[in-house]
Each structure stands twice: as C-alpha cells, then as structure tokens.
Design a protein with these regions (language model features):
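Short helix-capping segments at alpha-helix termini
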Residues: 75-84, 109-110, 140-142, 167-170, ...
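Catalytic alpha/beta core domains of metabolic enzymes, predominantly
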Residues: 138-139, 152-258
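C-terminal alpha-helical cap/extension of soluble enzyme domains
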Residues: 4, 14-22, 43-45, 54, ...
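A general structural signal for well-ordered alpha-helical segments in protein cores
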Residues: 33, 65, 69, 99, ...
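Glycine-rich phosphate-binding "P-loop"
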Residues: 148, 170-171, 281-282
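Catalytic cores of TIM-barrel enzymes
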Residues: 7-11, 83, 186-187, 195, ...
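Active-site beta->alpha loop and helix N-cap motifs at the rims of alpha/beta catalytic domains
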Residues: 4-17, 21-154
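Short, amphipathic alpha-helical "lid/cap" segments that border enzyme active or binding sites
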Residues: 34-37, 159, 292-299
C-alpha cells in the first residue's frame, strides 16, 4: 500500500459544519446560501462540508454540483480573504468513476479537500472500499476524508479497513457517523498516527473529542455554530468542565435535530431562525407537525439557556 507521501494529519481541527443546501422551489437559493456561509465564517467555524448528506448531495444534478462548488469558493473568498475556513466538498458516489470525476471537478474549482461517502446501495466488500478510496486518492492531491455512515449506505468501514485506507498518500481522516463508540475507539487506536477522526454524530461529539477525535463535522452547527465551536475549543484547551456544560446545553437540540431523518429537521430549524432554506427535495418530506413543535420548543429553550454565554452568537 506504500508509505504516505505527505502528512495531512493537521488538515483541520475543531468544528466543521455539514452545511445545508437551501432551495427555493426547484432551484438552489444562492442568496440564502451566501448568508449561511457568511454566518458560519463569522462564527469562526473551521471548515464547511458542502454537499454531504446534510446538503442533499444525492438530489443535486451534476450541473448544480459544479455551480454550488464554484459559488461556495467565491463566497468563502469574499468573506474570508485569508481562506482560514476550509471548503470540503462532498464527492462520494456509488460509482467509483463518478466519485473520481466529482473529486477532479472539486479540485479544479478550488476545494481545500473532499469528503467521500462510501459507495451506497452496491454494498461492496471491505476490499472494494479500500480500492474505492485508493482510486480517489490517485486522482487528486487534495486531502481526502473518508465518510462512514452505515445506517444510510448499507456498508461499514471496519477499523482494520480504515487502518489500510489511512496509509493512502492523501487521506486526511475519516468522518465517523456510525454511532458505535466501541468501533470509533478501535478505529482511533488504529489510525491516530496516520490521520484524524472527526465525529459525524452530534450526540457523540464530546466523547469522541475526549477520546482523541480531531474535531466534528456537525449538523447542529448549522443552527448553533458558535456553540459547537466553543465545545471543541473547551476540549482543546483542557477545560473539560466547560465542555461538559456546553454539551449538556446542546444535547436537547442535538436530539431534536434528529427527530426525523436528516436534513428534514435541520432545514426546518434554519427556517425558524430566519434563513429560508425551503423544504428538502423529494423523496424527503417536510417535517411532521408534532416534530416541528418539538423542534421549535427545543430551539427556543436552547437559545434562552445560552443567551448569557459570552461566546453565544447563534
């Protein structure tokens, strides 16, 4: 599998947001997308994961994908001239050739890195997973983050497979949204010398960080970017009591944002916050009324609880 040619272990640390994609009817709402990006940059988020699961990548056309990528680069550069906020573009597919093509487009348009979900529906073997990431890495010099979310894809990157994937020359890490803490710990044990692990399950952000995770790629950070950033910073600075306090304040909101399949609740939350992201594209539906009431209550209570926090700007 060869030695690593570059050290990408420090590609980014801390808080990243799995950004929603706002729609206005059938079209991407670029005016709102600009507001979302500007807000995240102002909140000090370290990276934006664009067109992942939360961004409804499965329902955008190839033309839209290119346009969204190009737009995000332009708007990031407008509000962040230093380019401190990394842009990580979702490029995974259930066809290796398509994933490679998406990655090449992302690189051409100015991505800082790519996030590649495992192939879905095909249910490939562990060897197939390794070869999938190998081909993506061969096609680009960009940092590549593997993305494991077996509940949505039907395949699971086992720790020993991720250990092999971590040896590929430009693997920067893995977004672990498996929800299995035992597997997360074993994966961390196997890869920590080679690359990073990022929490992809908001309810597990704190334990993953405390056990050596490099950061989070968060759905909740759409609604509460400064709070998620503060959680990560508290762990980094060793203020564990503070981290626990912030996590306890975030916990009810985390739960509410997953009362239905992602991104149905988070898009409803963004609408409530005044960022009119529209409804998810079919076959996803609008949030059920009872869940909407629960989400609205959780969001109101969270903002009330956080209003006296110095960092709170959400």
């Amino acid at each position: 599998m060869g030695a690593r040619e570059v050290d990408l272990k420090n590609f980014f640390k801390g808080a990243a947001t799995a950004l929603v994609t706002p729609f206005d009817g059938r079209e991407v709402n670029y005016a709102v997308l600009e507001k979302l990006i500007a807000r995240q940059i102002k909140a000090g988020i370290g990276a934006l994961a664009v067109l992942g699961t939360t961004g409804e990548a499965a329902t955008v056309t190839n033309k839209e994908r290119r346009e969204i990528f190009a737009f995000c680069v332009r708007i990031r550069n407008k509000y962040d001239e230093t380019r401190r906020t990394k842009l990580i573009f979702g490029c995974g597919a259930n066809d290796t050739r398509e994933a490679v093509k998406n990655t090449e487009i992302a690189a051409k348009l100015g991505a800082d890195g790519v996030l590649c979900i495992t192939p879905y529906c095909n249910k490939c073997t562990q060897r197939g997973l390794y070869e999938y990431y190998r081909e993506i890495c061969r096609a680009t010099a960009l940092p590549v983050i593997a993305y494991n979310v077996p509940s949505r894809t039907g395949v699971n990157i086992l720790p020993e497979t991720m250990e092999a994937i971590a040896e590929l020359k430009n693997i920067a890490g893995i977004k672990d949204a498996g929800g299995n803490m035992a597997q997360t710990l074993e994966t961390l044990r196997r890869i920590r010398r080679q690359c990073d692990l990022y929490s992809g399950a908001d309810e597990l952000n704190l334990p993953v960080l405390l056990c050596g995770g490099a950061g989070v790629i968060s759905v909740t950070a759409n609604a509460a970017p400064s709070s998620v950033r503060a959680l990560c910073e508290a762990v980094t600075t060793g203020d564990i009591a503070r981290a626990i306090q912030i996590n306890e304040l975030l916990a009810p909101l985390n739960s509410a944002l997953f009362c239905e399949v992602n991104p149905i609740p988070v898009k409803a939350a963004m609408n409530l916050l005044g960022f009119f992201c529209g409804k998810p594209r079919a076959p996803l539906t609008e949030i059920e009324n009872e869940h909407f009431k629960m989400l609205s209550s959780a969001l109101t209570e969270f903002r009330a609880a956080m209003k006296n926090e110095a960092f709170f700007k959400d």
